[in-house]
């Protein structure tokens, strides 16, 4: 399990190493947007390429051992806004949101208590309250209100009017001594200044003021296409990549002559105007998705749902995510989307939370999306699929080989649906940024290793799976003389067309090792005095620290073996 780590410290490490930067940091940054540095962009690119290779170019056989047919798509970020009307996003893609009248900030209503748990003022105040026993010390709370509280939560009722607020709390405790207040009840009391008039209030995580009522707020970013900024020119940045696939379903079918079952895959940016972006890159306003829409016969859709659910969990494990940290969870009836027949969230136990958080959703979407676009586009026939192979295979006993003529005989609907139907869709939808964060968290390790004198020292090592590691190998000349730099440069240039490799001849070799450990490089290759004698080099393994001598001609093969897919 990833240890609980300070995310601010972790974010600084990621910045210092060139994994992730705050976007436009020189101007104070912008909440919910992140940039990937030199190491981060390679890590994320490797993740996307591994996904494309394993799921699109070379997916494993299907449930019955059949070959899976997959193609790719790259859709526009801005589409005709009617797409989002048909999909239901314009009407329903919103979050319950509460605005603070004190500081003007917004908070997700359904995540209030989780956000409060991360609040600076709340964590400071909890030093004066025991959430297990419900006990507190009034003089200490008064001191906090007149001291730290003034700076951390200036609009909290306890800070503005501590005598009144504490009197409400004392009345509650004295009235029910056998049932001490819970943490949530305590928090509501310290946020309440006029109990009779307002009842218990809930505080703003930023300033402590009582929050307003919850309202549904659209999460879609709006813009305009063209120079006229009118209602007719309004467009949206896509909040998901899936709808572009559904809108192009018929185009793909006609241009590729694919037969069911088949999948359409897409990697691309999506945008959601999140109310409270938080937890580093986990909840961002701009993010990248890796999605598949897999189209199949309705009668076969359940087995395909189970296939993709199991395959996607296994894929994460093959790339270095410990099984104990992966938590597949079937969504309950109260949380599954109204159109979904079933959804499994593949969750990961991030170190910033006590509860697993979603990495990917595998949804059985039924025929909902194609049905919606068939209805709203007025082109219903384009979203139907005619199974010609099955029709021809069942020709025995029919009086006609024409499906149109057969339809004139008014066959039962169940018979028609064997040959002509709206396909069901299984959707494995993964977050490239969330998986990148999970890989960073999983890889981050501090351990003890011997230094040059044999004494133990602490090192930070990023234990990336070799397929995902930003740098596959680093090449060092042991010293900058005796022909070693020339041989090291030659090996570097020989490997560079095949892998992302790094050349370093600065400083002691031990320090060079440490720098590559922090970058997550699986192999360090050193050219030394023996290289000139027998054409061998030492290859150091990042995780075991073991070194072995290998022929220069075999170095490429050693690296390639470590990069072989394992799904």
PLM features: residue spans?
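NTP/phosphate- and nucleic-acid-binding module
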Residues: 1-567
């Amino acid at each position: 399990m990833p240890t609980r780590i300070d995310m601010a410290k972790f974010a600084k490490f990621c910045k210092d190493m060139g994994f992730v930067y705050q976007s436009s940091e020189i101007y104070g940054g912008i909440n919910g947007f992140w940039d990937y540095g030199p190491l981060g962009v390679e890590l994320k690119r490797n993740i996307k390429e591994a996904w494309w290779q394993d799921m699109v170019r070379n997916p494993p056989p299907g449930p019955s051992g059949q070959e899976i047919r997959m193609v790719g798509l790259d859709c526009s970020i801005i589409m005709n806004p009617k797409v989002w009307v048909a999909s239901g996003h314009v009407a329903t893609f919103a979050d319950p949101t509460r605005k603070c009248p004190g500081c003007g900030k917004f908070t997700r209503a359904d995540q209030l208590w989780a956000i409060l748990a991360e609040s600076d003022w709340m964590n400071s105040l909890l030093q004066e309250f025991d959430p297990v026993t419900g006990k507190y010390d009034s003089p200490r709370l008064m001191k906090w209100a007149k001291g730290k509280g003034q700076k951390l939560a200036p609009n909290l009722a306890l800070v503005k009017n501590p005598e009144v607020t504490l009197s409400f709390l004392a009345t509650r405790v004295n009235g029910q001594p056998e049932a001490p207040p819970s943490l949530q009840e305590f928090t509501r009391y310290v946020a309440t200044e006029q109990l009779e008039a307002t009842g218990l209030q809930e505080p703003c995580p930023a300033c402590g003021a009582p929050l307003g009522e919850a309202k549904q707020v659209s999460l879609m970013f709006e813009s305009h296409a063209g120079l006229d900024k009118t209602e007719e020119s309004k467009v949206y940045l896509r909040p998901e990549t899936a709808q572009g696939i559904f809108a192009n379903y018929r185009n793909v079918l006609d241009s590729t002559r694919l037969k069911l079952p088949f999948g359409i895959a897409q990697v691309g940016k999506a945008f959601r105007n999140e109310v409270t972006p938080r937890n580093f890159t986990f909840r961002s306003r701009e993010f990248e998705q890796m999605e598949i829409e897999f189209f199949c016969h309705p009668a076969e859709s359940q087995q395909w749902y189970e296939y993709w659910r199991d395959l996607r969990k296994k894929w994460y494990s093959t790339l270095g995510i410990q099984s104990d940290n992966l938590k597949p969870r079937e969504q309950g009836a109260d949380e599954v989307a109204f159109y979904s027949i079933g959804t499994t969230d593949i969750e990961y136990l991030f170190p910033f939370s006590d509860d697993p958080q979603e990495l990917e959703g595998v949804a059985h979407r039924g025929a909902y999306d194609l049905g919606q676009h068939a209805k709203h586009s007025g082109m219903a026939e384009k979203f139907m699929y005619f199974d010609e192979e099955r029709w021809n295979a069942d020709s025995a006993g029919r009086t006609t080989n024409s499906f149109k003529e057969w339809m004139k005989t008014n066959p039962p609907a169940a018979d028609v649906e064997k040959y002509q139907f709206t396909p069901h869709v299984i959707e494995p939808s993964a977050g490239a940024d969330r998986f990148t964060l999970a890989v960073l968290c999983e890889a981050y390790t501090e351990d003890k290793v011997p230094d040059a004198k044999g004494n133990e020292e602490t090192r930070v090592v990023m234990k990336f799976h070799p397929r995902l590691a930003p740098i596959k190998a680093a090449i060092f000349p042991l010293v900058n003389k005796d022909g070693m730099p020339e041989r090291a440069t030659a090996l570097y240039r020989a490997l560079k067309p095949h892998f992302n490799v790094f050349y370093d001849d600065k400083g002691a070799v031990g320090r060079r090792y440490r720098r590559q450990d922090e970058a997550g490089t699986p192999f360090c290759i050193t050219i030394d005095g023996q290289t000139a004698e027998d054409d061998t080099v030492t290859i150091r393994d990042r995780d075991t620290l073991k070194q072995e001598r290998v022929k220069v001609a075999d170095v490429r093969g050693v690296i390639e073996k470590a990069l072989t897919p394992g799904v």
